[in-house]
């Protein structure tokens, strides 16, 4: 599995219209486990501030499955989130 920095603002797996919101929500989730899942159409699901890794995964997949199909986890962990580039800030 690849490792490194996860950048929601430019991650091609996430639908373009959802990237800034995912990045903002991750930046605000400063404690616990944070998980991002996406489905076949790139609709994201988030599991934020979970006490346990498994809890975050379950939340993200449940959230994703409400709006997309065949959801899978694309990022997991306590994130260090960098600010959005000036051109993509709301």
Language-model features: where?
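Secreted/extracellular ectodomain signature
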Residues: 1-90
